[in-house]
C-alpha cells in the first residue's frame, strides 16, 4: 500500500489501513502546530470509512468520525452471502494461492481499474452493481489516480476474512459519528445498523 518500497506491491492490509488514520493523527498532533490536538477528526470515504471507524475505536485522539458512502471491505462473508461450504472453498482457494504465488515468483492480482480513465459514464463496461458503482467514480477522470487503481493481491482477501473493521464500533461512543449515504439502504447491513443503534442509545 502507499508508495513505500518493497515487494509484493498492492497488498491490502486492513490493520495498516486503520493504522494510516492514526499515523495521520500522529503527524497532525506533532508537526502541524496550528492544529488543536483535542479537535482532530477523520473522514473516511467508501472502503476507507470502515477503517476510519476501526482506528477511532482504539485511538481516543480521534474526536469524531465522518463516513461517506461507507463500504466495509472486511465483511466478505456478508457481501458474498456464502454458504458454509462456499466459504470454506473460498478460504481453501485463497490459502492454496499462497503456494502458487511462491512457486510463480510473483503474486496473483485482482482485476484493476483501467490504466487510463474513461471519458464518460456511457463508455464504461457493464459489470455487477457494486463494480459499476466503483467504476462510475474511480474509472472516470473525477476519481481516477494512477496509484489507486483498485489492484490488490488475490490473497489479500485472507486478511479481510480474519479482520473485522466494525467489531468495536460501539467503543467510539460517546464521540460522534456522522454517516453520509446517497440513499437510505445503500450498503447498510444488519451489523452496521446495530452499531448505529448502540451509538444512538448510549
Locations of regions flagged by a protein language model:
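Conserved alpha/beta-hydrolase "acid-adjacent" motif
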Residues: 164, 181, 185-192
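Catalytic histidine neighborhood in serine/cysteine hydrolases
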Residues: 198-202
